[in-house]
Amino acid sequence: MHTRAIYPGTFDPITNGHADLIERAAKLFKHVIIGIAANPSKQPRFTLEERVELVNRVTAHLDNVEVVGFSGLLVDFAKEQKASVLVRGLRAVSDFEYEFQLANMNRRLSPDLESVFLTPAEENSFISSTLVKEVALHGGDVNQFVHSEVATALAAKLKLAKP
């Protein structure tokens, strides 16, 4: 175990599916960097700083995990962090085509950067940040899909957003 890996994403918010993949990646790699993207093409509910804080809380028990916000190209962030592996999650066959294209683009931009795909535990295979936000927005209980601190933060965020 000698590799630095990056698990990139928007994490808006971090779900139990994300947390499961982070825990498993932490067992596979010496150091895992959770790269939280400041993706300008998306309009996240949580600020970059809030997302970094929530992921830090959820992963606090993992000594070899570091949480870093970033903007720009993922391959540049990987070089900056001296990472040689990208960890990506595949929930369903529908994720594969996009992830395959992304892996090939990343390989073209940075030939030494390898993509590794992990599938979630069955109980997490349907969870997405988008679905969690939708359930919460309509008053549903999201505690089975996210860490309790995330559920609390999401409820507060949605309450503030209501007119």
Swiss-Prot record:
Q: Which domain of life is it from?
A: Bacteria
Keyword Transcription regulation carried by entry: no
Q: What is its EC number?
A: 2.7.7.3
Q: Where is this site: Transition state stabilizer?
A: 18
- Gene Ontology biological process terms from the UniProt entry: coenzyme A biosynthetic process
Which reaction is the catalytic activity of this chain? (R)-4'-phosphopantetheine + ATP + H(+) = 3'-dephospho-CoA + diphosphate
Q: Could you say which enzyme class this protein belongs to?
A: transferase
- Report the InterPro entries cross-referenced here: Cyt_trans-like, PPAT, Rossmann-like_a/b/a_fold
Please give the chief subcellular localization of this protein: cytoplasm
Cofactors that this protein relies on: Mg(2+)
Pfam families named in the record: CTP_transf_like
Gene Ontology MF annotations: ATP binding; pantetheine-phosphate adenylyltransferase activity
Q: How does it assemble?
A: Homohexamer.
Q: What family does the Swiss-Prot or TrEMBL record give for this protein? A: Belongs to the bacterial CoaD family.
Q: What is this protein called?
A: Phosphopantetheine adenylyltransferase
Record the organism: Shewanella baltica (strain OS185)
